[in-house]
From Swiss-Prot:
Keyword Lyase: no
Protein name: Large ribosomal subunit protein bL36
Keywords per UniProt: Ribonucleoprotein, Ribosomal protein
Superkingdom of origin organism: Bacteria
MF terms (GO), sorted A to Z: structural constituent of ribosome
Record family assignment: Belongs to the bacterial ribosomal protein bL36 family.
Organism for this UniProt entry: Aquifex aeolicus (strain VF5)
PANTHER family registered for this protein in UniProt: 50S RIBOSOMAL PROTEIN L36, CHLOROPLASTIC, LARGE RIBOSOMAL SUBUNIT PROTEIN BL36C
GO process terms (BP): translation
One GO location term (cellular component): cytoplasm
Presence of keyword Transmembrane: no
Length: 37
């Protein structure tokens, strides 16, 4: 899980979602997981 100021999709399977007021990217590829900090 990377914490970034700007989260972007890195591939076609990445999805941008909101959980508990945080913007996150979830993906099958573990290195693509991101969270906005």
């Amino acid at each position: 899980m990377k914490v970034r100021s700007s989260v972007k999709k890195r591939c076609a399977k990445c999805k941008i979602i909101r959980r508990k007021g945080r913007v996150m990217v979830i993906c099958e590829i573990p290195s693509h997981k991101q969270r906005q900090g």
